[in-house]
């Protein structure tokens, strides 16, 4: 019985108790909260539902709690239910009910923890979206890991997810990129406000090798060649780096297409037609303050050119027109102003502003021996995705970026993540999975199986701790999806690995060489198998491998 199963039982029991006393069962909350008590001696789980409801139905919390506890204790899946304090109910599960969690995991396998909780959502998840003017830096690398994991978590909760990369190929930064490449090809210094680094020289040389006449064309033709070829080569490298990192996208959306297709003009005309765009001083302004923004925004400048926000507005409209009812933008720390701006754009276009969510990620710092690592071999002044992967590997890189909330800045200690010790979180979790696989191999050699295991034998305290931790996994996925916080999965994996290691140290799983096979061995092997499956499921959600040997 998982906490969710227990919550359902409590809800059903509470309805029966209230109805039998002519009390209003509609006062019960939609979701019954079930938690593990801080003191394990108080029971397996606790609920405060009596405190929540008693006053609403005109009885004391102690009375309602007593009635509920008596009714719950009569259920075969409950070993005991006791009233505590002003109206808390402490619950102990029967051994057979605890074992049901293990059986459910073994039956559901890779599906354990998933649900249809968010099946009503069609999500457009846009992340990374780095300009094609250089390799992905650490901030973009954080989004590559977190965004990919969030997509997996949302899908596990039942949502339909489209992963999207907004390819910024329209604007002055692309011109500066082209001029930087051209200068490198000519052997000239990097232009002011240009891009430097070894990668600029490499791309410039590749363009000249592909087009030997590149520098012999007219200035306009030469700049356009370096612009188009440079962007294509840079973005090809970005896509390859992301793919090797385990992050792929369903859609690569070109910003330029918004202008070439007329999408910007259509969005502007729609805003004019519905009165949410007005003219002042020769420019056209969005009435964004009517929709929660701190100021109105210029959409079409007085010279007739579109302001940057015009593309943002057209992009919002395009996403909704494609059928997405939740559009998540994952942006850097310098984009706080975009939250109100994008929601205002959606509302002005006639869409639900809650259909736009903006997640803001904070900075990432790389440290070695307490000193910041600031230089990249190829990129010059910034550390890149490739640098991080080269230093600590893909699994450690992804895990180090995912396990902390994006709301806070992140320091990555390279020495810690390189180490093969329990201090390294990803090593600790992966070692737990490898140890569980080793147990399975040894069990096969000994002829121990768990097909007919009596799971009611799992009564040791450490067994109970492990079973309860396993039972929390579905709720962890649900919370991670609802709150858009995939770091909860990584932290859960660490908790599960730690709980397993303590179980392993306290409970002999397999018979020793001179021992006969016993029912407890089969039961503990089943528990180990369920733990391995759940740990593998958690690692899959953060995009980290689950090694069978280490």
Curated annotation (Swiss-Prot):
- PROSITE patterns in alphabetical order: AA_TRNA_LIGASE_I (PS00178)
- Which InterPro entries would you find in this protein's record? aa-tRNA-synth_I_CS, Arg-tRNA-ligase, Arg-tRNA-synth_N, Arg-tRNA-synth_N_sf, ArgRS_core, DALR_anticod-bd, Rossmann-like_a/b/a_fold, tRNAsynth_Ia_anticodon-bd
Q: Which SMART domains does the entry link to?
A: Arg_tRNA_synt_N, DALR_1
Subcellular location, principal: cytoplasm
**Example of a GO biological process term:** arginyl-tRNA aminoacylation
Which UniProt key words apply to this protein? Aminoacyl-tRNA synthetase, ATP-binding, Cytoplasm, Ligase, Nucleotide-binding, Protein biosynthesis
- What's the top EC group for this one? ligase
Pfam families in alphabetical order? Arg_tRNA_synt_N (PF03485), DALR_1 (PF05746), tRNA-synt_1d (PF00750)
Catalytic reaction equation(s): tRNA(Arg) + L-arginine + ATP = L-arginyl-tRNA(Arg) + AMP + diphosphate
Write out the GO cellular component annotations: cytoplasm
What is the top-level taxon of the source organism?
Bacteria
Subunit notes for this chain? Monomer.
Record's NCBIfam families? argS
Its family? Belongs to the class-I aminoacyl-tRNA synthetase family.
Protein name, entry field: Arginine--tRNA ligase
Species: Corynebacterium efficiens (strain DSM 44549 / YS-314 / AJ 12310 / JCM 11189 / NBRC 100395)
